[in-house]
Structures are given as structure tokens and as C-alpha cells.
Amino acid sequence: MKLNTIQRKKFRVTGKLKKVASSDRLRLSISRSAKNISAQIIDDVKNITLVSCSSVEKDIRSMDKVNKTEISKIVAEKLAKKAQEKKISKIFFDRGIYKYHGRVKVFAETLRKNGMEF
């Protein structure tokens, strides 16, 4: 089966990160749509999701007059807080098929400000 451009790009980025995965350095996978953004910290050795956060959660969704970039910051802050509660600080940033620009860049910078290392 022939892969399209998006699938090739995803396999190229995520595949490299899965090869170097270890239990001390986890993978942060991010996904975004036109309205929402979500992220999860994954342990590729055990194949489990340790922490996740999304803009569709009730407390974030209920905010009025907040643009998508601000929502991205809020989700990143909440994810960093959840990760610190589970004593996770070192991660690989898996941007997937998305360019490191806009909401993805703001998300990554906010994570760095809140103590995550990648």
C-alpha cells in the first residue's frame, strides 16, 4: 500500500523518536485540529499513556473569548503541572506532522517555561 505525504511525514518524525525511546525519557505527542489541541506523554517501552491533556476538557472549554493560541498555552501549563505531579521532567517533543510554528511553537515554549526539558 502506498503512503501519502502526510503518513510518510508522520512515520519519519515519530519513527525516529520511537527508536531512541527509553523509560527515563518519554515522548510527548501533540495533535491539533482547527479548533482544539491535545497532548499526551507516552512511555514507548511499556506502551502506555502516562499523562494527557486536551482543550476539550470542561474547565478549558468553558472559557469565553480566548483565542486558540491562548488555549494552547493553558493546555501546556496544565500538562506540565500534571507531569510534575508524576515527577516527569525529561521528554522528547513529537510534533508529528505539524510544523514547529504557531500553536505548536507556543505549546513547546510554554512547556519549557514550566520546567519541562526537551
Curated annotation (Swiss-Prot):
Q: Which GO terms describe its biological process?
A: translation
GO terms for cellular component: cytoplasm; ribonucleoprotein complex; ribosome
Question: What GO terms are given for molecular function?
Answer: 5S rRNA binding; structural constituent of ribosome
Q: Which UniProt keywords apply?
A: Ribonucleoprotein, Ribosomal protein, RNA-binding, rRNA-binding
Top-level division of the source organism's lineage: Bacteria
Q: Which SUPFAM superfamilies match?
A: Translational machinery components (SSF53137)
What PANTHER family does the record tag this protein with?
39S RIBOSOMAL PROTEIN L18, MITOCHONDRIAL, LARGE RIBOSOMAL SUBUNIT PROTEIN UL18M
Assembly behavior: Part of the 50S ribosomal subunit; part of the 5S rRNA/L5/L18/L25 subcomplex. Contacts the 5S and 23S rRNAs.
Q: Which HAMAP family match?
A: Ribosomal_uL18_B
What is the role of this chain? This is one of the proteins that bind and probably mediate the attachment of the 5S RNA into the large ribosomal subunit, where it forms part of the central protuberance.
Spell out the NCBIfam families in the cross-references. L18_bact
Q: What's this protein's family per the entry?
A: Belongs to the universal ribosomal protein uL18 family.
Name of the protein described by the UniProt record? Large ribosomal subunit protein uL18
Tell me the organism: Pelagibacter ubique (strain HTCC1062)
